[in-house]
Structure formats: structure tokens, C-alpha cells
């Protein structure tokens, strides 16, 4: 009697294992079926999109009646057309870009404002993930910058309660390598808002009027995507002092500056658009650009003192693989007159000395050699006297 029972038990176990195996395969096939269904639906949608009729891009010129509008198609002619019932007609103001039906020319939907490719590239500049803790020796400057840029965007009711108008922008000025661009990147990465990174020299165009048009489009984009921060680096490229004599190129740069002044403080207010400008030549800037109402606060970022240099050096030396005790105070004592970029270069040179010695780590002697080497190269630099603006 025992043998048939054992045989039946073995058969049961065998069938149970087969059942589990088939059940596992069934689950895999169900997952595959879901994935294939998704791919099928995506292919169907793509096919419908390819088979659908295109639409004409137009621009609203004038509203005639409650239902009729004059629009101008991109290919030239003007039409009196109707509008879909679902669309909010109050948004169809003159200048609005719309999509028109191919056959009836009915306004089907709104289109966003046309953006210049240069402005689009500015808006997609990644500021990186920079925190305020990564900026050493500039605690006072960080506080002043956050009061002007961050506070009006995050807590505008504070200004309303006090009864003052929030500042529009600020100017960061000081010697090269002191962290002006790094400060702007930190503000942009800490705030959840749009960020336009503008290199001022790239705005200047060889064709008359193109530079001013780019400034207009830049500010229009910022107003459409509020809250927005516009960071203009090396502003002295277009913000130089105006003079009567000069070539046609100089006059074109002056026209660009006048457009910038108008956009910053014209009739069309900026609301939640903030300006940060940076330069290492504040003495060359036009007085109209520096007045309150355009750049309300001027933040001087000077060369770091001994304590600030120590903080900056520790930040730069943080990721480096070190061996033994590192005397940062001794290194800082040899770095008189260094800026933040120079201290970063000291860490890089120390790493290069370690590689030259076939080490996987940096020791105190490498830092001492590096700081002496950077100090020797600093003697070649010319010095500017930065007076308060």
C-alpha cells in the first residue's frame, strides 16, 4: 500500500512543480502582452497623427464681432474667420498666434509666442546643482543677493505689508575669479523658476536692429514664463558709457543698451522677472544702467580675506583624496591676494604634483608646492582698483 501512495505523492509534486512553472510563464506572457499592447497603442496614435490633416499658422490682427476675427496667414493673405466654441475669445488679442483649419480657416487653438532660437538656448542653460554651502567667504553677499532676488519671488507679501516696491535687480562687481557667476548659479539652482543665462557679447549682431530685437524677445520670453531670473554676464560688453563720437558698430551697441534700459524700466513692468548682472569693469558702465529702479543694489565681491580663503580652500579640497594631516592654515598664509579660482587651482596643481610622484593621494607637501607655483604665476597679472559703485 505504501508504494502507490509514494508514487501518487511524487506525481502530485511533479504536477505541482509543472503548474508553478506554467504559472510563472503565464505571468511573463501577460507582462509581454501589456508591453506589446502599449507599443500597439503608441503605433496607432503615431499613425493617426501622420494621417491627420495639418493646420495653418496665423496671427490675430483684429476682432470684428463676437464671433469673427481678422487673421493673417503666414503665407501672406488676410481672412475673416470664425472661432471654435470651446476657445476663450478673450485670449484672442491682436498679435496672438493661432492654428487655422486647412479647409474652413476656423481658429482651432492658441499657439505659444514664437521664440528666437538664441533665447530658447539661453533658457535651456543648466545652472547645475550649486548650493550656498559650496560658496565660501561670501555669507554677507549671499544674504544681500537673496534679499533682492529670492525674497520678492518667494514671499512677495512681505513687501506688500511694508508698502514698498520689490527691487528689480542687482549688479555683482569685483575682480575676476571671486565667485560672481557662481553666486548667480546658486540662486538659480535653489529657486524653482525659469533661468535665462545671457552672455552679453553674444547679443551683439552685425545687422542693425537685430541686437535690440533679441533683447525684446528675451524680456518677452521672461514675462511669459514668470517667475524668471535673467542673468547677464560681462554686462560691460553692451552696457558701456555712451558717447557722441564713434563708429556705426558703437552706435549699434548704444541702441542695444537703450533697448535694455527701456525693457528694464519702461511702461511694461517686469512683475516677477528679476535681473542679475555681473562685471569686473564697473567703472565703464553707463550711469543710466546703474540707477535705482533698474539695478537697485550693487554688491561688491572683493578678494577673500584669510578666514574666507580658509573656507574656500576647504570646500575645494573636500573631494580630494588626502593622506596624513593637512595644515590648511599654513597653506592659506602663503595665499595672500588669491581669489576663489586661484584656490581651486591650488588644489588642481596639488593633484598634478601627486600624479607626477605616482601617488593616489595628496599630501601636505603637494599643497605647499602648488600654492608657491600659483603665487609665482599671480605676479604676471595686472591689478585694477575697484571703487564702490
UniProtKB/Swiss-Prot annotation:
ATP binds at residues 174-181. Keywords: Acetylation, ATP-binding, Cytoplasm, Nucleotide-binding, Nucleus, Phosphoprotein, Proteasome. It holds the Pfam family AAA_lid_3. It comes from the Eukaryota. GO terms for cellular component: cytosol; nucleus; proteasome accessory complex; proteasome regulatory particle, base subcomplex. Component of the 26S proteasome, a multiprotein complex involved in the ATP-dependent degradation of ubiquitinated proteins. This complex plays a key role in the maintenance of protein homeostasis by removing misfolded or damaged proteins, which could impair cellular functions, and by removing proteins whose functions are no longer required. Therefore, the proteasome participates in numerous cellular processes, including cell cycle progression, apoptosis, or DNA damage repair. This is 26S proteasome regulatory subunit 10B. It comes from Bos taurus (Bovine).
Amino acid at each position: 500500500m505504501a508504494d502507490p501512495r509514494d508514487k501518487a505523492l511524487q506525481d502530485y509534486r511533479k504536477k505541482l512543480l509543472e503548474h508553478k512553472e506554467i504559472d510563472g510563464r503565464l505571468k511573463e506572457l501577460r507582462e509581454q502582452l501589456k508591453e506589446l499592447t502599449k507599443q500597439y497603442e503608441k503605433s496607432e496614435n503615431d499613425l493617426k497623427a501622420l494621417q491627420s490633416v495639418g493646420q495653418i499658422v496665423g496671427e490675430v490682427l483684429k476682432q470684428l464681432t463676437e464671433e469673427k476675427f481678422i487673421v493673417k496667414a503666414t503665407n501672406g493673405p488676410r481672412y475673416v474667420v470664425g472661432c471654435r466654441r470651446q476657445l476663450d475669445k478673450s485670449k484672442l488679442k491682436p498679435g496672438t498666434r493661432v492654428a487655422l483649419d486647412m479647409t474652413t480657416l476656423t481658429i482651432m487653438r492658441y499657439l505659444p509666442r514664437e521664440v528666437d532660437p538664441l533665447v530658447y538656448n539661453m533658457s535651456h542653460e543648466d545652472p547645475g546643482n550649486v548650493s550656498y554651502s559650496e560658496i565660501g567667504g561670501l555669507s554677507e553677499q549671499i544674504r544681500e543677493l537673496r534679499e533682492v532676488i529670492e525674497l520678492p519671488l518667494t514671499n512677495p507679501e512681505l513687501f506688500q505689508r511694508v508698502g514698498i516696491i520689490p527691487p528689480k535687480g542687482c549688479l555683482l562687481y569685483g575682480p575676476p575669479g571671486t565667485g560672481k557667476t557662481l553666486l548667480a548659479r546658486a540662486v538659480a539652482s535653489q529657486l524653482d523658476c525659469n533661468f535665462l543665462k545671457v552672455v552679453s557679447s553674444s547679443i551683439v549682431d552685425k545687422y542693425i536692429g537685430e541686437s535690440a530685437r533679441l533683447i525684446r524677445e528675451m524680456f518677452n520670453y521672461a514675462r511669459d514664463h514668470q517667475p524668471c531670473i535673467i542673468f547677464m554676464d560681462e554686462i560691460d560688453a553692451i552696457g558701456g558709457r555712451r558717447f557722441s563720437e564713434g563708429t556705426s558698430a558703437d552706435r549699434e551697441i548704444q541702441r542695444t543698451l537703450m533697448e535694455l534700459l527701456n525693457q528694464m524700466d519702461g511702461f511694461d513692468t517686469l512683475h516677477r522677472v528679476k535681473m542679475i548682472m555681473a562685471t569686473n569693469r564697473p567703472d565703464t558702465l553707463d550711469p543710466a544702467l546703474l540707477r535705482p529702479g533698474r539695478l537697485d543694489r550693487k554688491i561688491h565681491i572683493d578678494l577673500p580675506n584669510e578666514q574666507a580663503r580658509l573656507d574656500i580652500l576647504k570646500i575645494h579640497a573636500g573631494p580630494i583624496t588626502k593622506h596624513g594631516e593637512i595644515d590648511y592654515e599654513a597653506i592659506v598664509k602663503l595665499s595672500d591676494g588669491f581669489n576663489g579660482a586661484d584656490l581651486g587651482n591650488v588644489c588642481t596643481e596639488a593633484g598634478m604634483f601627486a600624479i607626477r610622484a605616482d601617488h593616489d593621494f595628496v599630501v601636505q607637501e603637494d599643497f605647499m608646492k602648488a600654492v608657491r607655483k600659483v603665487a609665482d604665476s599671480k605676479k604676471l597679472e595686472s591689478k585694477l582698483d575697484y571703487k564702490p559703485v
